[in-house]
Amino acid sequence: MATLSTHPNYGFHLGQAQGLEDYAPQSQLQLSPGMDMDIKRVLHYSQSLAAMGGSPNGPAGQGVNGSSGMGHHMSSHMTPHHMHQAVSAQQTLSPNSSIGSAGSLGSQSSLGSNGSGLNSSSGHQSAGMHSLATSPGQEGHIKRPMNAFMVWSRLQRRQIAKDNPKMHNSEISKRLGAEWKLLAESEKRPFIDEAKRLRALHMKEHPDYKYRPRRKPKNPLTAGPQGGLQMQAGGMGQQKLGAGPGAGAGGYNPFHQLPPYFAPSHHLDQGYPVPYFGGFDPLALSKLHQSQAAAAAAVNNQGQQQGQAPPQLPPTSLSSFYSGIYSGISAPSLYAAHSANAAGLYPSSSTSSPGSSPGTITPNGMDGSMDSALRRPVPVLY
């Protein structure tokens, strides 16, 4: 190693080579004119040794021959740029410098490979962006021609966005709309003419164009479940109150003015349900009236025998009647009036108990007992 460092053909010693930076990039490595001459001298010496085939005696000569052969091989297969790096590696022959040259070569090769990878990846990205840019046109979507406001706002929007980069797009649109409304007709005229020209050009390019707006599908839940329920309930109410097979023959319904089942209130237009009164059917009322008349006749018969006791109706009939009526709403005056009408519907259907005589009961007495029975307060569970 000492002989190589003091060889007469080498223009500098190892001490000079130790001052160079390890792993230095090629752009930062600057060669002096003296070092360039030394490199040329080493190349000439190595080529002459390779041509002669001889080598100096001793281990040092073998090392120089091996290094010269390697230098000749590298010089024949590498570019001058890489040759300078290989020659600098032969000249220094120190561990740090040799590692530095190898590291520089490795780093350069790795950079070259990475650079090719970056170039290929950038090429793929550019191709992908190009395909994305051309994809809307491939779908065949034709844009609508711009109107006068769009022609005017296209330039104004750019200017506002340039002056206020932090302003949101919605705020810019609001400002543009307000400014467009404040413009005079004479100021709008150039943009209106431009919009007409663009429309005529669009019709010429696309004669078969027809604007087809893409309507958003309506959610069935937004229509409101109450709406469908009210329509269905309205039909049911009409069927309940409609003319049946025996309605026109002689059946009179005194409760035709009641609201239908689940009918919405008209003053509030809200779908609060109103319950249907099943106790107001004519058949049920006739049975109730017969039971009340029989109970009243029995009470009157007992009152005549026991000194006119206060008439009392069986609680079962009244409880069944009012339990059927007061299902979800309280209107005592309405039901009292209907009960009175129901009592007046059947004036001749008075029946007496089996043990009473037919001549002891008068219609006036029965009416008085019915009035007293209907005027009594009845406890109602709300």
UniProtKB/Swiss-Prot annotation:
Residues 96-123, 347-360 have a biased composition (Low complexity). The keyword Membrane does not apply. One of its GO terms (cellular component) is nucleus. Initially expressed in a pair-rule-like pattern which is rapidly replaced by strong neuroectoderm expression. Keywords: Developmental protein, DNA-binding, Nucleus. Residues 53-142, 346-382 are annotated as: Disordered. Residues 60-69 have a biased composition (Gly residues). GO terms for biological process: axon guidance; blastoderm segmentation; brain development; central nervous system development; dendrite guidance; dorsal/ventral axis specification; hindgut morphogenesis; instar larval development. Disruption phenotype: Flies exhibit severe segmentation defects, including loss and/or fusion of abdominal denticle belts and stripe-specific defects in pair-rule and segment polarity gene expression. Mutant embryos also exhibit loss of specific neurons, fusion of adjacent ventral nerve cord ganglia and aberrant axon scaffold organization. Residues 142-210 bind DNA. GO terms for molecular function: DNA binding; DNA binding, bending; DNA-binding transcription activator activity, RNA polymerase II-specific; DNA-binding transcription factor activity; DNA-binding transcription factor activity, RNA polymerase II-specific; DNA-binding transcription factor binding; mRNA 3'-UTR binding; RNA polymerase II cis-regulatory region sequence-specific DNA binding. Pfam families: HMG_box (PF00505). Coiled coil: none annotated. It is found in: Nucleus. Its main location: nucleus. InterPro entries: HMG_box_dom (IPR009071), HMG_box_dom_sf (IPR036910), SRY-related_HMG-box_TF-like (IPR050140). Essential for segmentation and CNS development. May modulate the actions of other transcription factors, including gap and pair-rule proteins. This is SOX domain-containing protein dichaete.
